[in-house]
Amino acid sequence: MSKKVKKYIVVESPAKAKTIKSILGNEYEVFASMGHIIDLPKSKFGVDLEKDFEPEFAVIKGKEKVVEKLKDLAKKGELLIASDMDREGEAIAWHIARVTNTLGRKNRIVFSEITPRVIREAVKNPREIDMKKVRAQLARRILDRIVGYSLSPVLWRNFKSNLSAGRVQSATLKLVCDREREILRFVPKKYHRITVNFDGLTAEIDVKEKKFFDAETLKEIQSIDELVVEEKKVSVKKFAPPEPFKTSTLQQEAYSKLGFSVSKTMMIAQQLYEGVETKDGHIAFITYMRTDSTRVSDYAKEEARNLITEVFGEEYVGSKRERRKSNAKIQDAHEAIRPTNVFMTPEEAGKYLNSDQKKLYELIWKRFLASQMKPSQYEETRFVLRTKDGKYRFKGTVLKKIFDGYEKVWKTERNTGEFPFEEGESVKPVVVKIEEQETKPKPRYTEGSLVKEMERLGIGRPSTYASTIKLLLNRGYIKKIRGYLYPTIVGSVVMDYLEKKYSDVVSVSFTAEMEKDLDEVEQGKKTDKIVLREFYESFSSVFDRNDRIVVDFPTNQKCSCGKEMRLSFGKYGFYLKCECGKTRSVKNDEIAVIDDGKIFLGRKDSESGSPDGRSVEGKGNLSEKRRKGKKGS
């Protein structure tokens, strides 16, 4: 009788290993590599430009024993590599296959959920490493190494600080700086918002654009106490259920509804995907959380329909939805983020999850269930009211719920009521409300809205949204105040340098085009070498490692002598200086934006439009004493 071959599965994390082990039992041993085992070296560039961008890989410090263990497992028996199904995971699998001399074998398994049905199917159908996906990931890694290893030392040398520059992070920083510049330039216009209230309903004056009325007109409008129904149109309006979550929409909704940062959302989602201990063993609660897709498997749809029928009735089950046109930026055919078992209700899950895990799971569970339900239906009444002489008109809309559909699960706020009047009928009394308001600029980004914009523009990927924003915050390039993101002095000065010298690196369109190129490498339409050559030719033509960044900007700050102060950078960091010799230090994280060569410190309140700059009058301090006699240092 032949000896039974031992079987091993390699995953990234212990939690994932434990969940898979609880499914497969003693049939397989499951080992965690703890993420990447090999990468470009930290101590040197690690890319041979003379050999067509050949990478020089090295075992990550502290992972030597992991590599030896993997080699040992490959010698002992059959080794299956089950790292994540995205590009990063494919690259990890490739490195593992290389060090274990198993490249070319069908030893790669992928899955979007860690459930018995899917895991058992995956181990039956191993495939070879997807080298197109690996090349796309290696190209991204080398591109980022070229940019980071070239530009970061320039920033270190000039600012004596652990700063960095990169393709995605710099393009994202540009979005925040550009928005602050828009707010700075915005000139508010006053206008009147005029409404009439009657029978608990509201209608707004009908004008082509927001306008400011003169006093005589306002007095005339204020005297209106009766209107006539000129037009009434009734129709049935359906509201389609939301799609199940993908990475970006989960991050946005968790930020909006739960107040979670995008990093916190991804950390908790990872825990729910990899598994949590329950009475039935280690169980995964959601599918893979880094995805561009809203696709749902037929199996999951059927499970959802069964639950909806059981709990709410067959009339709530959504029809087979027509597959929507796929987004050109979607990286591959992942599934949406959904519960692995829709019958695991949030109440039941709460027995095993901590508070934050339960909140996020409930959000995912409700969104998925709602996505498989019928649209909600309302009776929509659009009406027009006019004064008897026809001089002024007011328009309004009111909704009356007919069928709640998906809103049974996914609550939505709508303006509901009834319009009991008919055309020609008089509406009396009416109360006129006149409010003087100002136009407002676009709001500053929150973490959620920044992710939405990054996705819309094609900057980064689901796996990089959270880490990019976290990096910008950690570097001090941006600052979060009451949930809104502001550029700082250091962020604005670095961005000004990058925009002037490396406009392509920070260009949103260039960064998005580069992501498209990487997609084409993965699809086999382009080679990684061509993408790298094209980028390097452009980048190397402007790169100068000896660049000196001169910080000398006029500011919006006045000295006590009345003259404008300038921003400079010296031995002790950023500071303001005046011709009269007075100086004042400023913190790296003070809010600032550069516009037309001038740096504006403080912030402009987007609600009121009033400046919030801080005066520097009479602020002699320690840094002034340090710099005495060192003007212009």
UniProtKB/Swiss-Prot annotation:
Keywords tagged on the record: Disulfide bond, DNA-binding, Isomerase, Magnesium, Metal-binding, Topoisomerase, Zinc, Zinc-finger
Catalytic center residues: Y288 (o-(5'-phospho-dna)-tyrosine intermediate)
Gene Ontology MF: a single term: RNA topoisomerase activity
UniProt xrefs under InterPro entries: Topo_IA, Topo_IA_2, Topo_IA_AS, Topo_IA_cen, Topo_IA_cen_sub1, Topo_IA_cen_sub2, Topo_IA_cen_sub3, Topo_IA_core_domain
EC number(s) per entry: 5.6.2.1
Site positions (Interaction with DNA): H36, R140, R141, D144, Y149, W156, R290, R475
Region (Interaction with DNA), start-end ranges: 164-169
CDD domains given in the database record: TOP1Ac, TOPRIM_TopoIA_TopoI
Region of interest (Disordered), residue spans: 601-633
Zn-finger segments (C4-type): 559-580
One BP annotation, GO: DNA topological change
Toprim domain sequence ranges: 6-115
Domain Topo IA-type catalytic: 130-543
Domain of life: Bacteria
HAMAP family given in the database record: Topoisom_1_prok
Subunit description: Monomer.
Entry's family note: Belongs to the type IA topoisomerase family.
NCBIfam families: topA_bact
Known function: Releases the supercoiling and torsional tension of DNA, which is introduced during the DNA replication and transcription, by transiently cleaving and rejoining one strand of the DNA duplex. Introduces a single-strand break via transesterification at a target site in duplex DNA. The scissile phosphodiester is attacked by the catalytic tyrosine of the enzyme, resulting in the formation of a DNA-(5'-phosphotyrosyl)-enzyme intermediate and the expulsion of a 3'-OH DNA strand. The free DNA strand then undergoes passage around the unbroken strand, thus removing DNA supercoils.
Identification of the protein by name: DNA topoisomerase 1
Organism classification: Bacteria, Thermotogati, Thermotogota, Thermotogae, Thermotogales
